[in-house]
Curated annotation (Swiss-Prot):
Belongs to the thr operon leader peptide family. HAMAP family: Leader_Thr (MF_01907). This is thr operon leader peptide. InterPro entries: Thr_lead_pept. This protein is involved in control of the biosynthesis of threonine. GO terms for biological process: threonine biosynthetic process; transcriptional attenuation by ribosome. Pfam families: Leader_Thr (PF08254). Keywords: Amino-acid biosynthesis, Leader peptide, Threonine biosynthesis. The keyword DNA-binding does not apply.
Amino acid sequence: MNRIGMITTIITTTITTGNGAG
């Protein structure tokens, strides 16, 4: 569960950064 949460956070951060940059 902890690993899933970390992966979700990384994916969310990546998407947010991509949208912000794009």
